[in-house]
Regions:
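Histidine-anchored nucleotide/phosphate-binding helix
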Residues: 219-227
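Ferredoxin-reductase
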Residues: 98-186, 204, 240-242, 267-271
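A short, basic/flexible loop-to-alpha-helix module at the beginning of a structural domain
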Residues: 191-202
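Short, conserved phosphate/pyrophosphate- and ester-handling motifs at nucleotide-, phospho-/glycolipid
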Residues: 134, 214, 305
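Short, structured interface segments
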Residues: 73-96, 185-187
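Reductase modules of NAD(P)H-dependent flavoproteins
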Residues: 1-78, 84, 233-336
């Protein structure tokens, strides 16, 4: 067993040989930032000040060779070879909210488009799930694999969990959900997970950018804000290939109609002039850049494909956004 000291906070925890640094930190109740937990998003990146680690497989875009040479590590993939002293951010807002393993029952299935289904999971009657708006769950499958999905409802909605599932061609789990898994099926989950959640203590206006089912955590955040009368200005940008891919568009339109602090800007990238679309066209991050010449006064949440998240971060920071005000959740597809 190896010992880890977080230098900037003084917190310590032990790591068993079978664990990554992140797994051990979560078990110890120490909240490091993280997203995908499989080396794809880079949210858990920090610095090794002393000691050595071995990395599991990860994507080069999440940790470059130059960063690795400079002593950076992805804590979701890093396994200590000796005692460590590390430097990383910690998240105070989720202190006291530890992930738990729970049984859930499929309560309701509703297909919203060719490849998106809403899944309502019912919790046991004696259980309540405490979470932050925007966090995610993981299904624990019988073969040992895990599948992660963002929570789409707000924390005040008790007793159930809403998920938005995109069907992935050849994807074992999502094809089961769409084609084989009936209502009343019992599954196991671990929840809540992730450091992508609404920072309620900030008072800056918010830009939210959602691609595809990246809308799920954004929906939870906005409904949480409405319920708690958090009236900060919100600019909601949704990106999709075609207008038909903007599921729950009517809900977003209602938010913008009845909530004066919410503006809704849907953007499609692959439509043509004969598709009856009279809204914005192009790339969703580019629409943000066109509308906001100076991003220095904003807080930004981006959720969707890793490529979209990466280019959004690069260009938004270049346009004045403080890097610490950029929060993201990159949706990566698990191996089939």
């Amino acid at each position: 067993m190896n010992h880890v000291l977080i230098e900037n906070s003084g917190h310590t925890f032990d790591v068993r040989p079978s664990q990554t640094v992140l797994e051990a930190a979560i078990e110890a109740g120490i909240n490091l930032p993280y997203g995908c937990r499989n080396g794809a998003c880079g949210a858990c990146k920090g610095k090794i000040l002393t000691g050595k680690v071995m990395h599991d497989d990860y994507q080069g875009s999440a940790l470059t060779d130059a960063e690795l040479s400079a002593g950076m590590a992805l804590f979701c993939c890093a396994r200590p070879l000796e005692d460590l002293v590390i430097e990383c951010r910690q998240i105070d807002m989720v202190q006291g909210i530890k992930p738990r393993i729970l049984p859930v029952r499929i309560q309701h299935k509703e297909q919203l488009s060719d490849d998106v289904m809403v899944l309502h999971l019912q919790l046991p009657g004696t259980e309540q799930l405490t979470f932050m708006a925007g966090q995610y769950i993981e299904f624990l499958l019988k073969d040992g694999r895990r599948r992660a999905f963002s929570i789409a409802n707000a924390p005040h909605e008790k007793g159930f969990i809403e998920l938005h599932i995109r069907k992935i061609a050849g994807g074992h789990f999502t094809e089961q959900v769409f084609n084989e898994m009936p209502v009343k099926t019992i599954l196991r989950i671990e929840a809540p997970l992730g450091s992508f959640f609404l920072r309620e203590q900030n008072e800056k206006p918010i830009i939210m950018v959602a691609g595809g089912t990246g809308f799920a955590p954004v929906k939870g955040m906005i409904e949480h804000m409405i319920f708690n009368q958090i009236n900060r200005p919100v600019y909601l940008y949704r990106g999709a290939r075609q207008a038909a891919d903007l599921y729950m568009d009517d809900l977003c339109q209602r938010w913008a109609q009845f909530m004066p602090n919410i503006q809704y800007i849907p953007v499609i990238s692959d439509g043509n002039n004969g598709d009856n679309w009279d809204g914005r066209r192009g790339l969703v991050h580019q629409a943000v850049l066109e509308d906001h010449a100076d991003l220095s006064g904003f807080e930004v949440y981006v959720c969707g494909a890793p490529g979209m998240v990466d280019i959004a971060k690069q260009t938004f920071v270049a346009q004045g956004l403080p890097e610490e005000e950029f929060y993201s959740d990159a949706f990566t597809f698990a191996p089939k």
